[in-house]
Amino acid sequence: MKVAAGNGILIFALSVFLISLWPADAAALTLSYFAEGAAGVRTNDDTTRKDGYNLLEGRFQVKGSHSPEALEDWRAELTGKAELLADGYDESLKFILREATLSFTPADIVDVKAGRQVLTWGTGDYLFINDLFPKDYVSFLTGRDDEYLKVPSDALRVSVFADAASLDIAVMPVMEPNRSVTGTRLSFYDGTRGAITGDEANRYFQKPAETIENIELAMRAYKTFGSFEGALYYFRGFYKEPRGIVDAATERFFYPRLSVYGFSLRGPVLGGIGNFEAGYYDSAEDRSGLDPMAENSSIKYLAGYTRDLGNDLSIGAQYLVEQMLDYGSYRSSLGAGEAVRDELRHLATLRVMKLMRDQTVEAIFFAFYSPSDNDAYLRPSVGYKITDNMKVTAGANIFIGTEDHTEFGQFERNDNIYARVRYSF
């Protein structure tokens, strides 16, 4: 059955937002703004569209909220966040709607939020197992603010708070994929060509049809046990990366169906905060592992620990293991010359954060290292809050690897140094 309007929730929420955002009392409308300029230069020549840089842009954001008197009994709130982006790399001017929601409380234990919104949950730091909501890794790898790692979805979210457990349900009528690396701004390893590819890549990603059967569903049930919070997760939808191949010769890819069942536990451990999370990825397109055109099922495990060492210094470490299931079937289905993935992929991360000068300076070092892939990704950054309104941030994205086909090794020629200036008012 065809969905009559794939973006119906967005259109409805935005319409209500625009109409209701004209309160009789201007004081009832809360607005905030920021203007930001960002630039990032590459340290290597490559085959991308513009070799000298991969970030040059200015953006202006408006964020507003309003509590309409007509829905006062339901504690309703309308929120919106919109941006105007002048992108020098793409040579384009874009209007971006990041948020347009109506939230209300129809009962004491129920909250509802409908419209365009950023959804997230899970316990990882830059590592996501049960968070199957869309991400923008192009922004992440080129120096944009962390806010832009999370991509908004058109969704209905219902939260129920009960003594037995609390429940979050998110329904996404239209599948929103990740913003994937395609070669335009960042080069990558193209498995169909067996080489690093840039702007010459001509990939086509086939999104699922907008039908009732393809509506995505995400659920989380969570409860506190003493000082620990435990959670169960369920997701039914699609991989957010195009991990299926329609036709390798014409570089056509699709997003395979996916169900995920997971859990997490988080609480105090040895003077810090520990977390453990796991998820079983059921790849509906290839449960046997024999189809080389679709992703195998897998299990992912994550353990993490963070601690405040005092004097405004904190550290955090994580260890992730990704286990491919039916690995023998995967190996037997490989074609001649294809890069071979490991059955177990290991990934460790380290975060060190230091605040200085009355907490106006924030220095962060974040590192990814995979002992199985023998590659790494380093993210140093320093932010300085010059005034209450102005902040300057500088950092780098550094990739290290010995093989072209590994997660971070494929990006070795994409090293970049960036700077951002933001003025909020």
Where are these regions (language model features)?
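Detector for outer-membrane/organellar transmembrane beta-barrel domains
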Residues: L71-E72, F235-G237, R266-S288, P292-F368
